A protein has these predicted regions:
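Rossmann-fold NAD(P)-binding glycine/threonine-rich loop
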Residues: 93-161
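Redox-cofactor binding/interface segments in oxidoreductases and associated redox assembly factors
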Residues: 78, 84-85, 146
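N-terminal Rossmann-like dinucleotide-binding module
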Residues: 5-31, 35-38
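Glycine-rich phosphate-binding loop and adjoining beta1-alpha1-beta2 segment
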Residues: 25-62
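Conserved NAD(P)H cofactor-binding loop of Rossmann-fold oxidoreductase domains
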Residues: 87-90
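Long, compositionally biased stretches enriched for glycine and/or charged residues
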Residues: 186-441
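Rossmann-fold dinucleotide-binding core
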Residues: 17, 143-212
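Short acidic low-complexity segments
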Residues: 66-79
């Protein structure tokens, strides 16, 4: 590879400036020649705004990178070396429904967990598989770097249902946890290593090392301190019960609050929706503010306000991964990849989120073995939910969708699961043609 071509699907995303910043910072290691930002007709205006900011950022850098804006996905994919996906099918309006409808039934309404995660997968997976068909024809040797949520399910769907096996799923949660732990330990993050294992948005830190020495006991005490909670912009920092964390002997990710503190998180969500609206509505206002900033012809850097969007560290994760693949670095990064026995208690062809050695051949997972008993059951239950959801997304099988909804631990009963499923299917009908091509219930 000389002079890299990158195609970013969902290029009109508010996250794009962070990605551009990452490529500029790493140019010496990652000589990007072309960046193609792709979007759909509905995202045309945002693509223009964010694309022009990207061009100004590149111009300021003085680097010989060409930024192209297009609505023609196939043009962008032709001969690409890396394809990044950061799309949102149905935009924030769909997310708002994912969050609001379950709340009516006293069920968590969240973007990637419970009913919301199920429906985001149902909408997103067919679109990603369609992109992969184009990749098989136009850039069969490209790497697909996916950060479209739910990243784990999307990655697994690609692995199981397409010929694109050079796929890696990315999330900013593990890097956010490592940075958070470094802050608690008051050290530079480069000195901190976390043994990550689990699934996307269901990942645990099984051990924490400082300069190669385990500091797990110290960290377990730090993360139970009410003043030192690790969370994200989009998740309430409800305090963990100290004795629970000591018993778990693992660092939960912020999303685990939905499973271990379901009642409290539900109450918090309901209160927040009354005061501020759903998270989607909050994000929509943040995005409107960001795009107003992006329009400024004098702006030629990523604005710091982007971190409020909840996307901190995405650029670091994505650009570090691409740089390591390109340079065959052999460093360790947590990513979503094929299990292949890495976690003994999960199917081999499933996607898991684990530490991997990153090479030019892609991620080489570091063996985990069996997950500890206290975390194993929940991870297995979520994996059953994920696999059933993927099958529903691919086939449009109503019964599989209902089964997935019902076995998710955030649902109280099969009856409520069916009520939510039916209402959400109708609400998202235009993005779920696979369920409406035939009448069957």
């Amino acid at each position: 590879m000389t002079g890299i071509k990158i195609a970013t699907i969902g290029g009109g995303s508010s996250y794009t400036p962070e990605l551009i910043e990452g490529f500029i910072k790493r140019y010496d290691e990652l000589p990007v020649r072309e960046i193609w930002l792709v979007d759909i007709e509905a995202g045309k205006e945002k693509l223009e705004i964010v694309g022009n900011l990207a061009k100004r950022m590149v111009k300021k850098s003085g680097l010989p990178i060409e930024v192209h804006l297009t609505l023609d996905r196939r043009e962008a994919l032709k001969d690409a070396d890396f394809v990044t996906t950061q799309l949102r099918v149905g935009l924030l309006e769909a997310r708002a429904k994912d969050e609001a409808i379950p709340l009516k039934y006293d069920v968590i309404g969240q973007e990637t967990n419970g009913p919301g995660g199920l429906f985001k997968a149902l909408r997103t997976i067919p679109v990603i598989l369609d992109i992969c068909k184009d990749m098989e024809e136009l850039c069969p040797n490209a790497w697909l770097i996916n950060f479209a949520n739910p990243a784990g399910m999307v990655t697994e769907a690609v692995l199981r249902y397409t010929n694109i096996q050079r796929v890696v799923g990315l999330c900013n949660v593990p890097i956010g946890i490592r940075m958070g732990l470094a802050r608690l330990l008051e050290v530079d993050a480069s000195r901190v290593h976390v043994d990550f294992a689990g699934l996307n948005h269901m990942v645990y830190g099984l051990d924490v090392y400082l300069d190669g020495v385990s500091v797990m006991d110290r960290v377990l005490e730090l993360v139970t301190d009410p003043e030192k909670q690790i969370t994200m912009e989009n998740i309430a920092a409800l305090n963990w019960e100290p004795d629970f964390i000591r018993g778990l002997r693992a660092i939960p990710c912020p999303y685990h609050r939905y499973y271990y503190k379901t009642r409290e998180m539900l109450e918090e969500e309901k209160e927040a929706s009354v005061e501020k609206g759903t998270r989607a509505e909050v994000v929509k206002q943040l995005e409107n503010d960001l795009f107003e900033l992006y329009k400024d012809p004098n702006l030629d850097i990523k604005p710091p306000q982007l971190e409020k969007r909840g996307g901190a560290y995405y650029s670091d994760a994505a650009c570090s991964l691409i740089t390591s693949i390109y340079n065959n670095k052999g460093d360790i990064q947590p990513v979503n990849t094929r299990n292949n026995g890495t976690i003994a208690s999960l199917p081999h062809d499933s996607a898991v989120e684990v530490n991997c050695i990153i090479t030019k051949e892609g991620p080489k997972p570091i063996a985990v073995g069996d997950l500890p008993v206290p975390v194993r059951g929940l991870v297995q239950q979520i994996k059953s939910f994920e696999r059933t959801t993927i099958e529903a997304a691919v086939t449009g099988d109503y019964h599989k969708a209902l089964l997935a909804m019902t076995i998710n631990p955030l649902l109280p009963s099969d009856k409520v699961a069916k009520q939510i499923l039916d209402e959400m299917l109708e609400a998202h009908k235009e993005y779920l043609p696979q369920f409406f091509k035939k009448v069957e219930k």
